[in-house]
């Protein structure tokens, strides 16, 4: 702001400055939250130790599994308050969650070898996909076409699989000879599938064909220590990687360069999503304290953007 020349101009500028100062003092103007600094969203212990699978809707709410007790999905509001949104069928326990649109969500049931579809208005739950040859499944990723990809680890044997779930709900095993497949994500252009192997400490990249099959397996990133869990992309194709055991989340460029490392206030972050009202809040499921933590980011999340009305 520039103030010069005549007295009347000076008085006008002083008046504007006073209005701005009063607004700041009265709380009308609020400084933006700093980026990549984690703070708690919920109270300690509102989830079980199975807290996982965060996903964000268009209204700024966050959904995560095992709220209050196993077998539930909780809905957490932007102020940190929450409620049980749905109870999964008896014996089922959820893990990864993905929104297909503003009308339904998909939930990986790692006990019953299912992927559920939950209608958001009615909260009705149906089996979208089932295969007895699945170990779990664990986490989910969605292509622009609506095709789902599921990671499927066998923790006891140290092995894992990748599945493609078509629009008709039919599951096709793409790879059956991998390590402990866990975090999974599709790039913004739908051409690359990322899959993390937790125990092996590696993230693989695959090319995605026009038919949804994957090929061209290659190392995207390796780690010398600790595990890794959830993967999520922003609109620019940067990956957010939860480092289970390290207590951090990495922001990684599409070329594999680490851009940010965020301390998330607990040693065992299990998964992450990007959402909030503007798509620029990261929500992390934090196992050590059984809570959600949050931090602001510089670019909106990919899944959040896809939910926006066109």
Which role does the model predict for each range below?
Residues 64-83:
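Beta-propeller domains
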Residues 76-81, 119-123, 165-169, 208-211, ...:
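Short loop/turn segments that connect beta-strands within beta-propeller blades
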Residues 271-310:
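Blade-level signature of beta-propeller repeat domains, shared across WD40, Kelch, NHL, RCC1
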Residues 29-47, 217:
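A short helix->beta-strand "capping" segment at the edge of beta-propeller domains
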Residues 72-74, 114-116, 161-163, 202-204, ...:
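A short loop-to-beta-strand structural motif that recurs across blades of beta-propeller domains
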Residues 42, 83-87, 126-130, 173-176, ...:
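Beta-propeller fold detector
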Residues 12-23:
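Bacterial N-terminal signal peptides
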Residues 45-62, 88-109, 114, 131-159, ...:
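Beta-rich, blade/repeat-based domains predominating
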């Amino acid at each position: 702001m520039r103030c010069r020349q005549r007295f009347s101009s000076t008085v006008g500028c002083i008046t504007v400055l006073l209005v701005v100062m009063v607004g700041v003092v009265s709380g009308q103007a609020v400084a933006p939250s700093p980026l990549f600094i984690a703070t708690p969203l919920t109270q300690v212990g509102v989830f079980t130790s199975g807290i996982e699978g965060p996903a964000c809707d268009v209204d700024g709410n966050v959904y995560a599994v095992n709220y209050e007790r196993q077998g539930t999905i909780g809905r957490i509001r932007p102020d940190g308050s929450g409620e049980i949104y749905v109870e999964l069928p008896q014996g089922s326990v959820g893990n990864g969650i993905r929104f297909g649109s503003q009308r339904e969500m998909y939930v990986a049931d790692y006990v019953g070898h299912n992927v559920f579809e939950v209608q958001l208005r009615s909260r009705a739950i149906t089996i979208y996909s089932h295969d007895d040859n699945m170990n779990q499944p664990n986490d989910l990723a969605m292509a622009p076409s609506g095709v789902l990809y599921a990671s499927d680890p066998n923790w006891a044997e140290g092995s894992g699989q990748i599945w493609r779930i078509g629009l008709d709900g039919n599951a096709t095993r793409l790879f059956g000879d991998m390590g402990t497949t866990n975090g999974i994500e599709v790039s913004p252009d739908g051409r690359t599938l990322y899959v993390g192997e937790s125990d092996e400490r590696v993230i693989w990249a695959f090319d995605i064909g026009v038919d949804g099959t994957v090929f061209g397996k290659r190392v995207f990133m390796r780690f010398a220590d600790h595990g890794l869990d959830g993967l999520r992309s922003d609109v620019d194709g940067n990956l957010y990687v939860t480092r289970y055991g390290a207590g951090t989340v990495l922001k990684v460029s599409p070329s594999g360069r680490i851009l940010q490392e965020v301390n998330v206030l607990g040693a065992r972050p299990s998964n992450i999503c990007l959402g909030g009202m503007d798509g620029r809040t990261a929500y992390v499921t934090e196992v050590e304290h059984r809570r959600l933590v949050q931090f602001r980011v510089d670019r909106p999340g990919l899944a959040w953007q896809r939910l926006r009305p066109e």
